[in-house]
Design a protein with these regions (language model features):
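Feature for exported/extracytoplasmic and membrane-associated proteins, marking the mature portion
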Residues: 1-212, 216-224, 243, 257-334
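Hydrophobic alpha-helical bundle architecture
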Residues: 220-228, 232-251, 259
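Glycine-rich and small/hydrophobic secondary-structure elements
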Residues: 254
Length: 349
């Protein structure tokens, strides 16, 4: 992971040790919902932590959007569909794209009025979203076309491909606040490592690709003059167990490290290396040191400049008592606007 190590040395990366939550759930679907919603493991929450933030900052969305204050998408998911992360109380606050060029498909024309029925209300909503998509496609195309040169990204690296799109749109002038990308393959129940050399194998290859992609992204942002606007964060719904199983893999675990990156990150290591018991079994987990909701809350307060009382209100009942303010963002990075004015420059990926 030489790329991430280089950023760490440059003061642009942070490792948070053993991030998790109490009473972890080991189902892929349920654990993903917990991480995206910011809920406790015994709570069913149908909105996302970023969606609730965007719903606070841009009330009544999608009605009245885009507008002069916020002409751009609020959140963008690079992929085929939006996720729970950007789900607000009544609508998903984001949109998904695969590529700025192929996405652009401007359609114009008039439509018949919707009937005054429940089905008509649904049709009106669908038309509103469709119209927004057409309008947003125009600004996305313009932002993409505003960038004529980018830095080099690693070949055959899907994460790098996604981050390259994000860098292009940020540099091109989109005011979008949150971008989401994804990179899979880490569910290594078997063949996580090569039996002859456990420093190599599937897991090592995946981490190298993550490292290379993040380094290329950060370098690209720097050469385009926008690195101070962007903070990045990694997460997964699981850690892995302490001890490998009989298939040279590891099963679903509890706590895991998170990486943060950007020029405004308070770089370094947060937390201590976990103590590994000599007699650990395949069922043992790394103990949690930090609650993942504290990471979210700190970014909302210190990067998106929200008052702590507002931050607390954006989490499900009972969560605010668990939240810590963590040393993740450099002092002065927040522009101290509370509540934040629409279109502030801070971007989270």
């Amino acid at each position: 992971m030489t790329g991430l190590q280089s950023l760490f040395t440059e003061g642009k990366a942070k490792v948070i040790q053993a991030v998790g939550y109490p009473q972890p759930n080991f189902s892929h679907f349920r654990a993903t919902d917990i991480w995206m919603s910011g809920s406790n493991s015994n709570q069913e929450v149908y909105s996302g932590w970023a969606g609730r933030y965007l719903n606070y900052e841009y009330p009544n969305f999608p009605t009245g959007y885009p507008n002069t204050d916020m002409p751009d998408p609020l959140a963008i998911q690079i992929g085929s569909s939006t996720t729970l992360t950007s789900q607000g109380s009544t609508a998903n606050m984001g949109m998904s794209i695969t590529n700025p060029t192929t996405f652009y498909n401007l359609i114009s024309g008039t439509v018949d009025p919707a009937p005054a029925t429940p089905a008509g209300k649904e049709l009106t909503y669908i038309r509103t979203v469709n119209q927004q998509t057409q309008q947003y496609s125009t600004v996305i195309k313009a932002a993409a076309n505003a960038v004529t040169q980018q830095g080099a990204y690693p070949a055959n690296n899907s994460l790098g491909d996604q981050l390259k799109i994000v860098a292009r749109l940020v540099s091109g002038g989109l005011k979008t606040r949150v971008y989401m990308v994804n990179f899979g393959g880490f569910d290594t129940h078997s063949v996580q490592v090569n039996a002859g050399d456990t420093t190599t194998g599937t897991h090592a290859t995946l981490l190298q690709r993550v490292s290379d992609a993040i380094k290329a992204f950060q370098d690209d942002l720097k050469q385009m003059g926008v690195e101070d606007r962007v903070v990045g964060m990694t997460y997964s719904e699981f850690g892995r167990r302490i001890k490998s199983n009989s298939s040279t893999g590891t099963d679903h675990g509890a706590a895991a490290p998170m990486f943060l990156f950007g020029s405004k990150i308070e770089a370094g290591m947060l937390g201590v290396n976990p103590t590994i018991p000599a007699n650990a079994s395949v069922n043992d987990n790394i103990p949690m040191q930090y609650d993942f909701r504290s990471v979210y809350a700190t970014l909302l307060e210190k990067w998106f400049c929200l008052d702590k009382t507002i931050v607390d209100s954006l989490f499900p009942p009972g969560i605010n008592a668990q939240l810590q303010s963590l040393p993740l963002i450099k002092a002065g990075a927040c522009n101290t606007v509370t509540p934040p004015a629409p279109g502030n420059d801070e971007v989270l990926i």
